[in-house]
């Protein structure tokens, strides 16, 4: 049994695993200007940007800096949004009572010192659902933080996957 454990240790010892981030130290500062918004929904750009910044802080690899002092700049644009009715309330005719909200962002990651594009126009999509309870605007506003959180996690994952 001891020889099996030693053999297993020898084999697994050959596997490479890094603790921490593989992002080079000189590239661990990032700026995230407010996302552009072509989604057709006002205010979602600021909310998504705020959640992306929070997610970078939570994840911990990058320090948030202003554009002039960061090594990387993440540019984002909300390029598409869709509302799809999922269920209807029979008491109010054919009015939808639940919707799926989809939001697509396009991100570009630039190494500021060289201008090199590390990510170029990568599209990332997030979805959430919401109930209208008779008020579409309130339902949408309630959905904004959920979709922003999901989208921000996918955006940060895409940036980290570059390394």
Question: What are these model-derived regions, one by one?
Answer:
Residues 18, 59-63, 69, 73-118, ...:
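Surface-exposed short loop/turn segments
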Residues 140-163:
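Compositionally biased, intrinsically disordered linkers/stalks adjacent to structured regions
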Residues 36-41, 134-144:
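Second-shell loop/turn segments in exported
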Residues 12-54, 58-69, 113, 123, ...:
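A structural "domain/chain start" motif
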Residues 1-14:
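Sec-dependent bacterial lipoprotein signal peptides
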